[in-house]
Amino acid sequence: MDGKEKKSGSKRGSKVFQFDDDADDDEPIGSLLEIMKHKSSKKDKVETESTGKQRQKQVVEKKLSALGKDSEDMDDTLASFRKRLKGNKKGVESGTSRVRNHEGVDTVTNSNLKPIEEANKNEVQSVLLRENGASNSIQKCASETGTLLHKFSGKDKAASPSHEKVETVSSEKEADVFHQITKEESEIPMSEKAVELSRVSVPMPDVHGEVNCTIAPDKHIHLGEPTSESGYYREKNLVMCDCGTQFNFEDRSFESNTQVTLCQKCKYSSHHNASNGGGIQVNTLEDGTAQASPVSIIPCEDENFRGDAISLPNSGKPSTLQRPERIAKKRKLGNMVYEGDVKWENEQGFLDCQSDKSFKGSDKCGFVPSISKEIEIGRAAAVTAGLKAQSVSPIEKIILKEVLKRKGSNQEYLVCRNSILGLWSKNVSRILPVTECGVTGGPSESELPSASLIREVYKFLDQRGYINAGISSVNGKAASSTNQDYDLLQGRQLEESSMASVADSEEGVAFILGQVKAVESTSEGKKCALQNDERDLVGCATSEMLESISKKCEASIIDDNKRSVSMNALQDSTASNVEKHPETFSVAKPALSSTLSSAHSNQMRGRDCVPCEVIDEKKVIVIGAGPAGLTAARHLQRQGFSVTVLEARSRVGGRVFTDRSSLSVPVDLGASIITGIEADVPSERMPDPSVLVCNQLGLELSVLHGFCPLYDTVTGKKVPAELDDALQAEFNSLIDDVDLLVEEIGKERANKMSLEDGLEYGLQRLRMPHDKVNIDKFGLLNSSSKTGIRGPFMQDESWKDDFLNPLERRVMNWHFAHTEYGCAAVLKEVSLPHWNQDEFYGGFGGPHAMIKGGYSRVVESLAEGLDIHLNKIVSDVSYVSDVSAMDNSKHKVRVSTSNGCEYLGDAVLVTVPLGCLKAETIKFSPPLPDWKYASIKQLGFGVLNKVVLEFPTVFWDDSVDYFGATAEETDLRGECFMFWNVKKTVGAPVLIALVVGKAAFEYTNKSKSEHVNHAMMVLRKLFGGDLVPDPVASVVTDWGTDPYSYGAYSYVAIGASGEDYDVLGRPVQNCLFFAGEATCKEHPDTVGGAMMTGVREAVRIIDILRSGNDYTAEIETLEKAQRKSVPVRDEVRDLIKRLEVVELSNVLARQSLLRNMFFSAKTTVGRLHLAKELLNLPGETLKSFAGTKEGLAVLNSWILDSMGKNGTQLLRHCVHILVRVTSDLFALRLSGIGKTVKEKVCAHTSRDIRAIASQLVNVWLDLYRKEKANSGKKSLRQANTTNTSRIRRKLNSPDTDSKGKLSNGNDVKTDEEFEDNQLPMSEEEKAVFAEAEAARAAAEAAAKAFSEAYHNTSLQLPKIPSFHKFARREQYAKMDESDFRKKFPGNVLGRQDCMSEIDSRNCKVRDWYDFPASCLDLDSARIPVDNYSQPSHSNELVSHSKFRECSGESVAADTSFLTGAWVDTGGSSDGFKDSQAIDRWQSQAAAADPEFFNRTLHIKDEEDSIACSTGPPSWKHDQRANECSVSQVTVNKEPHKNHIRSADRLKQGVVDFVASLLMAPYRAKKIDRDVYKSIMKKTATKVMQHTTDVEKAMAVTQFLDSKRKNKIRDFVDKQVDKYMVIPQVPKP
């Protein structure tokens, strides 16, 4: 252009064809096309000549689309076609074109065009983008016009039509394009000149149609249909296409050559030539629906042709040629995988193709992601969303049955689904649009086959609440790249008012292109008309958002007299609040306090009953603003429904309530615990849904630890650990044997028994002779009630004392009370067979946690943007019961409140607590069906209360999260039985006492002060009256008498079952729906369960109101059938019967039967029964099948499945089995059970589980030592293959011969002991053994000399090790197995949390503590301990030579480190030390200590080296020093010590203990060296500052008792939390 345009050629990948000059002009076009269709190898060229005048010759690719014209036109010759193309030259130059808008088609001439400068800013204009210039206006693609833009010739001037017309300009010349994507970003200066719009060729096989580009107003443009109810807005200087892709030319720079910005979704392209003044050419191609289009016949070598409607200029008038469509079978491209192909999921990269990439003519993305990482992210995201990671759930089978029934579609679907879920999990705070998944918002004929699958999966995930859930919004905390190129709603204060979400299409995709600005009221039938002169806002908002804005609302007020009046609601500038309309959702999101206070304020002003109607908008009324109601309302509103929430309280949240006024800090008086914060992918357990909102808000969680010390109120001391562990194991066994008891006594009888009866019966069977245990005493005289416990057994407890002493009874009662806390009911009222029916679902994954700042922050965030009416006590709900009447009725439900207001809607969702339904506070008309009332009556609703105490200081053990207290009386066992230490959560000394069971039901019999006094009495008994100050503030709850809850949460009462949860949640007449925790059988009594039911019912309402199908009911039926297919108790009965059959047969038959059942057991109860039988088998028999790789894999699956609720007993038995069958470390590694034990079992909350795990680790370590000893000998046999040249060289050495004679016999003898079946050794092998033995003998002699010389040296004072050495300590701690030789009693662990009870009996516990952290990875292909001595030879010797400096209690180092590290065979990559390594070690040892070879070393055997004492000989029999440090080096105490040395010794003990705590985060690189040193210094200094002279004289273990260790651990944890950098959750 301007005579300076460079030649442009077709780049690789483009498919632009050119007619040859010598083509036969008389040849029919159809035959010509047929010939060109098969000339795929021919390369066409486009040449551009620069002369005095602009000349361009370009052939543009375009598929022909038939619109109804006969096929005769294809017989036109090329000559006639060229003649018609030329037409009237004057008409072309004058820019005559044909224009079509949504109202009609008009012809526009030059006289009708106006310059851009004169155009009205508020009109939709069309601009001609000319060369050497750019437009400063916004460009918009509107496919509805169906027109094309073409380039004017250089003589034409910029002009624009009126806003009612869209101009189409054609040109004789067309320009080619380069298929190159711009990658750099910068600003393009926009001039006043118009930028020329030109149609460009996009060489894509699925290119289709055209998109009209117009200019929008200066501020905003409207996308979508002209009559759309929702408008979308974008900042100026944006070019947008129909698929939702935006191009911001203001922020993008173009390279010096011609480039194209290509929309991968709809093939929208923008062409720019920087060499000509930055002109931008924009074009998109769509399906052939346009009635005005130029002829462009460009065949794709692998595609078929379609005819397009063409518009030809003829004497200044547009003409249209409609050509028939030629339909032929598509040929598959060789480089593409189509829908249904097996490799579809492997080549699908649609979710990773979000950035600009070079286009090479293929639809596949050029980005190859990290497959394994993306797959893991997708699977974790699927589990987090509540789906299965690698299989299809029942809901997917029902909804997507058409998609899944194709061959190979399951795997394709899973890949697609997990990819979309993983994409959203990377930023859960924003709404993921479908366009970011690589497809357009709507289907098209020429899109990839996978696009329909992606769109269908996205629609399913979005509508079912698996993505874009919680409080996600368009403007998330970290917006995606597609949302960073522009600002939404320029000029608006988004931080003050963000717009609500509205579904923009039936695809269920909201906010793909932008935020909703207004809901256009184009229909005259709408009764609510809102007038706003300045802004088009919808709904009624608070005065903060409607200042100086007047509005008029005409609506029908429904009152007691059923009068209809017209009301003008004018905004008063002095008014503080304005009531929101109940039947329109609020568009704005003001502060929650303002939103809620507005409803209360206007209720007092009598303006609270103004329902507004919008035609064709479904209205849903939600009763209750708890977690379930808010979650449902939010999902319904985002899907385009009008939602009104009615709440009886003056606040939102329901039973979630954070008190911010009674104490100095906010405290949760209702729900307070998130019952699972992490997705457990192996067991497919999702986290609590409230965690999603916490992540979206960035809330900080306080993770709870499982250790709960138990105090006895009678003695005022801790319950002995041995007794506590024994009784806890006994109680867990009783709980797990409940299912067996049910099978034993029969279901009919068991259904009439309570859980307490079953536990007492099981306890008697364990403690009493069988002839004295009578089941008839249980369950017959019982009578449950709603208020407390009834029956003779709670009145007379003397019969229980026959087999339990008083202390045991108090401890057992505490465990009973803890179970009552889980059920919120007395055990006498809980069903025996169904009390834990939710165990089948496993609960939520991850540890429990509390929210800093309170749980109300979650529900308050859910309430933002919703139309909530507070203080609305619902009294009556009327619904249409007749189906025929329902079809004729405009409104199906009517909700009335106590103040006379009524609300009409299409559906009502009842989320009130079960206690309110039991109390019948809401009257239903007609009454609820009998089956609904039966479930309401049968299910139980329990009570849990709290006594919150705030103290001036902390007097309890602040390192624990909770502690228990026994009760003297059985009836009062649940009163203040547990105290929650919430100091680290709330930041103040606060304890929360729990009141459950009978004490909670009799709660009202005492006053608030009496409850506080009782809690204080218990605390003073536990900690001493003088140490417990009076509380500075207190709060007492009483949920049982709350008129809006009547309790805490639900439980399965006697006579009920888990199916009652489903029955309670079923809808009535498809217009009355129920949600809440009492309708969630999977997760009852949890906030997460309530939120899940809210989404469930919202989805059900959407399905019924839109399609009339209740897919949720189908899912429940399918799941019920699946549960019956694997009946729990039927499997137990089958196991028992089969074992009874072979009881009298031979032993081998029984063992074979157990083996078969071991590999086929499916249920937890069946596995538990089988595990008990397996433990009775002989060890070798059990090891023969359970110790193999397959058997260990089965045990691994059992352990993973037992990590859910109430699986402790099965887990305990599995670990016992592992202790007995472990004999092959290789099989252990291959099965994956080592990792499971390390990550799951070692971190288990149960103390007895950790104690058993310690025994298992001992077994593994012993087995490892034996295997290593054997491998050392066997590895020497292989040395000749790698060191042949070196061996031959040394064979000729006389030293080698002599060394061989010294030890060859011993070596052979040792080899024969371990390898009886080995072949005779060759001469070279013997030489290797001789060399190694010689080196060993020399090293032992040197070590012995060093040891004897060291004994004679004067003792030195211990030195406080430098922190640099402590940071390096892990090197010599890893050198060999000497650290692992230190055994510890297996029954010591379990007193406290792994490291809490380190005393003289378990001083070797460091081995156990380090093992799960990083010392032994049993899943690796090699045991990494073999490699621990490899990293640095020099560092190893320095560490060993100065090892005594690193021991806080020693004056003489344990010489086993010296002999074990290099003398023993092991530690190299091949499992042995060669002579070079030994020589190197000797030279380094001599360099470190010149007297090394002049000393004698006292060598002890392996077991003695575990605790060897290297002090002076005269002290040989002195008592061994107490050890509690990381070094674990044993020393003899000196007879004379001063306070300085004692202080150093204590300080060293503290340093060692702190090092043990910091080693794990340091090795995990969560803290660096500086933080390590800083925490070490601070901790040691603080501890020693508070140490008295009397304490300095104590032994280390006496000084570091459990209480002091807990304080140190808590201090270290706080320091680590302070310094550790917490990574952002991708969410995960």
Curated annotation (Swiss-Prot):
Biased composition (Acidic residues): 19-28
PROSITE patterns, sorted: SWIRM
Compositionally biased region (Basic and acidic residues): 43-64
The entry's keywords: Chromatin regulator, FAD, Flavoprotein, Oxidoreductase, Repressor, Transcription, Transcription regulation
Pfam families associated with the record: Amino_oxidase, SWIRM
Enzyme class: oxidoreductase
Annotated spans, Disordered: 1-71, 1271-1317
Binding site for FAD: 647, 649, 655, 1077
Cofactors required: FAD
Keyword Lipid metabolism on entry: no
Signal peptide interval: none
Ranges of residues in domain SWIRM: 378-478
InterPro entries in UniProt: Amino_oxidase, FAD/NAD-bd_sf, Flavin_monoamine_oxidase, Homeodomain-like_sf, SWIRM, TFIIS/LEDGF_dom_sf, WH-like_DNA-bd_sf
Protein purpose: Probable histone demethylase that reduces the levels of histone H3 'Lys-4' methylation in chromatin.
Protein name as catalogued: Lysine-specific histone demethylase 1 homolog 3
Originating organism: Arabidopsis thaliana
